[in-house]
Swiss-Prot record:
Coiled-coil intervals, chain numbering: none
Protein name: Required for respiratory growth protein 9, mitochondrial
UniProt transit peptide range: 1-68
Keywords: Mitochondrion, Transit peptide
Compositional bias annotation for Basic and acidic residues: 89-101, 139-148
Keyword Cell division annotated: no
Subcellular localization, as worded in the UniProt entry: Mitochondrion
Family classification: Belongs to the RRG9 family.
Function comment: Required for respiratory activity and maintenance and expression of the mitochondrial genome.
GO CC terms in record: mitochondrion; nucleus
Amino acid sequence: MLKPSSLPSPLAVPGLLRSFLGVRLALPATYRKYSLTAPCPTCSVTRPSPKCWQSLSRRQFSKSPTILLHLSDTPEKPQNSSSTLEQSHQQEELKPDRDSNDSSSKPAEMVSPMGPKSKAEFTGSRSARATGGKAGRASKSDKLDAPQKLEPWQIQKQALKKKFPEGWNPRKRLHPDTLDVIRHLHQQDPKKYTTPFLAQEYKVSPEAIRRILKSKWQPSEEVIAERRERWERRHKRIWNQLAEIGVRPQRSKFADLSDTRILYGSRRTASSK
């Protein structure tokens, strides 16, 4: 018979039975995943897995379903385990609130490093800068608003703008024969050849047509003869200019009134004298 001291305790009997019968407890998935040893695929020797150093957080460990089931199955101290889990959950939930409260209270509790003297100096320098900037802007605006000294050509341009607000539009000078034709047409049919119609036809202002019809001046015979001579000379001079370019043929009777003859003839007469 066995001695009473060598008899196994009633708590060790279930463990011995399990070892003899080969029964294995169902470990949770977290224990399998983060176990300290992992079986090698080639041999039966166990080697440390690289995932063994990845420690579980308290929340993940406590919320795993297998662990909760295992804890519910154990009859020893069920009230203490549930109370500890609830306390851990409450502590984790209160942590972010404490952090947020600390972060919100920090800026309020911080004391400004600037003393009363430094604050006064800062405000004084700021006001001085503001006044200096305003003074600089005012001086620039005064310089821009001040009248600049105009050059002669600018003064002349302003005077021409005042004299001719619509721009340079010189009066059109009509030929004396055209003036006679305007008078003749208006005398024949005043209703048809009105002042606006004649102004549009000859491209002059109605005021100019009105003055032409109003005037009664007629040139004398001497003025008419002088005018014809002047027109003939002009005609010959223009003909000679076009002949030199090659547009018109040369004419010997117009050679005396050419520009070259007039220029060199005046020089020869001056040298002979």
